[in-house]
């Protein structure tokens, strides 16, 4: 009987720990993206997905000097809520806008049919720069965002 009581007391705590590990893995930058593979893409915005849990910007990399795969890319940004708090809304990136995106390529490096990356910054032709929101646990910090805690 005592072992059943102990199990009843320990099981909920264990379930919470396991749930936290799964949630952390989902939101881990290092699970999907490679901090040793920085990218720079130059292209025109084709589509913006303003959805949870992450926004996505679709563009074609057309930079002739780029060492990255030319063609379609999906670039992950922060959550819509994170971006809204930074003053970015669904109308900040209009279809057809020319942008430069810096970020990090996916670990799988698969580009069929579309390459994937985690975006860090978007730069507009007039020089304005937008931070694309939190890159998640394990993402490199370059100090360009004042709200980021220092890397430990």
What are these regions (language model features)?
Residues 1-5:
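N-terminal secretory signal peptides that target proteins for export/translocation
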Residues 30-152:
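PEST-like low-complexity, intrinsically disordered acidic/proline/serine-rich tracts
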Residues 8-20:
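Bacterial N-terminal signal peptides
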